[in-house]
Each structure stands twice: as C-alpha cells, then as structure tokens.
Amino acid sequence: MLDSKLLRGQLQEVADRLASRGFSLDVARIESLEERRKAVQTRTEQLQAERNARSKSIGQAKAKGEDIAPLMADVERMANELAAGKAELDAIQAELDSILLTIPNLPDASVPVGASEDDNVEVRRWGTPKAFDFEIKDHVALGEISRGLDFEAAAKLSGARFAVLRGPVARLHRALAQFMINLHTGEHGYEEHYTPYMVQAPALQGTGQLPKFEEDLFKITREGEADFYLIPTAEVSLTNLVAGEILDAKQLPLKLVAHTPCFRSEAGASGRDTRGMIRQHQFDKVEMVQVVEPSKSMEALEGLTANAERVLQLLELPYRVLALCTGDMGFGAVKTYDLEVWVPSQDKYREISSCSNCGDFQARRMQARWRNPETGKPELVHTLNGSGLAVGRTLVAVLENYQQADGSILVPEVLKPYMGGVEVIR
C-alpha cells in the first residue's frame, strides 16, 4: 500500500508514475474525497473548540447562579454534530483506504518503461541451449515413455491442470525441492520454515493478493467461521510472519525459505499452456523471502536473484534474466527480475522464477517495522520475495534438457545424491 501522504502531497506525480504501469488513478475522485475530508476535519475542530468554550461557560454560569439550560443544550447539540462529523470522517477514510488497497506500487526509476512483456529488457544469459541430433520430445511425451507423468489419472481425480507423478519422476521432483532447500539453507543463509497452506484474508491483504486478485485464489468458505484461502505462494505465509512486529536492527536481514504446494485458479489463463505441467492449479515451489533495512533492499534484490540463478547454474540449465518493464511488473513490486529457463520443445525461454523488491508496500499493509538505531523510532521494513525455484517447471526443464534419443532422462549430477542410485530414468 502506498503512503497516503503521497496522495495528499504529490497526487499528480503519483498518477503519472502509475500511468507508466498502465494503471489509471482516479485523481478527481481522490481530490474530491480529500477536499471533503479537509472540510469535515476543519468543521470538527471548530466544533470541538466551541464545545470546549461552552463547557467552560457552563462552569462560570453555574458559579454565578445563572440558568445553564441553554448552554447545556448547545453542548449536547455540538456533541451530536461532533459524533456525526467523526462518523463522516471515518467513512471518508474508509473509502480512501479502499482505494489505496487497489493501487499498485510505484516503479523504481531504474525500471524500464513499457506496456507489456514485449518491452522487458534482457540483462544477461547463462549457458547455451543444447543442439540435439535427434527429434526432441516434450516433457509430456517423455513422461509417457517412463510412465512417470499421468495427466489422465489426474483428470479423473481433479479435472484439468493437475498431474500425477509416479516412480523415478516423482522422486526426481522431490529431489529438486530437497536440493533447492539444501542449497538456500546451506549456502545462501536462509532459515527453513514449514508454514500453513491455508491462510485467512488479512494475510493475503498484507502481501497484496487481496482485495484485487481474489478471483485468482481458491477460497474455502466455512459457515459461522472465517474463510480460508489456499496459498498461491509461500510468500504470503513467510512474509506475514513479521506482520505487526517491530524488529531489532540486529535481526535484519531476515532470510526465510519454504517448500510448499501453491494453488492458483489461473482465472486469466484460459486456453494458455493447457498441455503438460507449465501451468497448473497445484504446483510445488521453493520460495525465498527477505526482510531488510530500507537502504539495503536494492542490494538484497541482486543477491536474491543470484540465489535463484545458482539453482539453474548447478543444474546446468540454460537461462536468461529479464528486467521487467513497468507494465509487466507484479502489483506490489518496485522492481522485478524474471528468470526464464530454456525449454527445448518450445524452442524458447519460459519463466521459472520472479524475484521482486516490494519496498515498504507490503510492510505498510502489515505494519511490519524495525527500530532504527539512529532515531530510536519504529520504521517500515522493506520486503523481497523470489522463487527459488518453481519445482514443476524445473522438472519440465530437466526432463527436456536431459533427454536422450530413446526417451530416457539422465539425472543431473547435483541430483544424484537424492536419487538413491538412479542415474537414468527410463
């Protein structure tokens, strides 16, 4: 959530910066509400001053033995007007707050300006896509050969956009997640967490999924009790661990990681990636979250992105890094890098990780703060998150990049310790 002071003092500048994201801020509505708020606030303050003066006059009139009934009536009238003014102020503020909850974050000055993914800027590449000397198969066909991927069985259970994994392919999927967690905890300094897969609405509001993106979520309604939502990412549960907290400077940076299933309705993805595991309603992901001092968040973003890249490097999977443009960034991001891995059957790079600096956007929603030792006062932290990595898409990349002419799959060297002696999946 943006600082409301920005809307009061720099409304047009904020509107211009949001326009670069393709977001049209209703300036007239905000100006109208702000004018009403100021007018009611001024009138309320005047009434309070008049009421205080009348109350003082009552004491003086009493001492003189004068009739205080007219003064008492005046005070009662003012009290009623004050109550009405407070109710109106609360209603105006609630409307302003509801607007604030739908406004995306302001892009950093270093973010390339653009309207869509076509305007993203490639920052670097790593590795060279393999030149196969046989006709390559996609991961669905490879999964059929090994009987390791079964989409028909999943459809019987749950419908479209689900998968059943079995045998060595299921083990490879588990190996990938274990490898990622071990790398991030052992070499990158993250603390592993196991968190709930269901959260309530305030947690999703804290990280920005609610109220704007409810249609993308799976909701569990319970009569007489608060609703649950299945997490779309462990970013929600990990980041909200600091909601309402005031952290000591020595606790920062916090580096948290979790391996969880993620659940998304893919409401806006009708007809896209309907084959295979690229876009699923349920998928596993290893998520990294950092909570840092504001002055260090851009540096932390580079480190977070490097942590995600290291997974791909050790798996020897070719990838590229993109700086997302203003029009393609996520709702809460100040700046985002996407990692895209090479998928041979599609002859292109596909997103496998998104690493974002959210500045104080989420922290303001959650009231997550740290005590600045220089001022002694609580201030908002900055939060970052990134996939390290999406496990299902990494499995797709491994199956396709490590395929052999007969449809078998070589196990990447770094995964062999997790595979119980299996070196080739047939």
Swiss-Prot record:
Pathway entry: Aminoacyl-tRNA biosynthesis; selenocysteinyl-tRNA(Sec) biosynthesis; L-seryl-tRNA(Sec) from L-serine and tRNA(Sec): step 1/1
Enzyme Commission code: 6.1.1.11
Matches recorded under Pfam families: Seryl_tRNA_N, tRNA-synt_2b
Gene3D superfamilies in UniProt: Bira Bifunctional Protein, Domain 2, Serine-tRNA synthetase, tRNA binding domain
GO cellular component: cytoplasm
GO biological process: selenocysteine biosynthetic process; seryl-tRNA aminoacylation
Intracellular or extracellular location(s): Cytoplasm
Residues annotated for L-serine binding in this entry: T233, A234, E235, E287, S387
PROSITE patterns linked to this entry: AA_TRNA_LIGASE_II
Protein keywords: Aminoacyl-tRNA synthetase, ATP-binding, Cytoplasm, Ligase, Nucleotide-binding, Protein biosynthesis
Amino acids binding ATP: R264, S265, E266, E351, I352, S353, S354
Single GO molecular function: serine-tRNA ligase activity
Reaction catalysed by this enzyme: tRNA(Ser) + L-serine + ATP = L-seryl-tRNA(Ser) + AMP + diphosphate + H(+); tRNA(Sec) + L-serine + ATP = L-seryl-tRNA(Sec) + AMP + diphosphate + H(+)
InterPro entries per the UniProt record, alphabetical: aa-tRNA-synt_IIb (IPR002314), aa-tRNA-synth_II (IPR006195), aa-tRNA-synth_II/BPL/LPL (IPR045864), Ser-tRNA-ligase_type_1 (IPR002317), Ser-tRNA-synth_1_N (IPR015866), SerRS_1_N_sf (IPR042103), SerRS_core (IPR033729), tRNA-bd_arm (IPR010978)
Recorded superkingdom: Bacteria
UniProt key word RNA-binding: no
PANTHER family: SERINE--TRNA LIGASE (PTHR43697:SF1), SERYL-TRNA SYNTHETASE (PTHR43697)
Free-text note regarding domains: Consists of two distinct domains, a catalytic core and a N-terminal extension that is involved in tRNA binding.
Matching HAMAP family: Ser_tRNA_synth_type1
Subunit: Homodimer. The tRNA molecule binds across the dimer.
Record-stated family: Belongs to the class-II aminoacyl-tRNA synthetase family. Type-1 seryl-tRNA synthetase subfamily.
Summary of the function given for this chain in its UniProt record: Catalyzes the attachment of serine to tRNA(Ser). Is also able to aminoacylate tRNA(Sec) with serine, to form the misacylated tRNA L-seryl-tRNA(Sec), which will be further converted into selenocysteinyl-tRNA(Sec).
Protein name as catalogued: Serine--tRNA ligase
UniProt source species: Pseudomonas putida (strain ATCC 700007 / DSM 6899 / JCM 31910 / BCRC 17059 / LMG 24140 / F1)
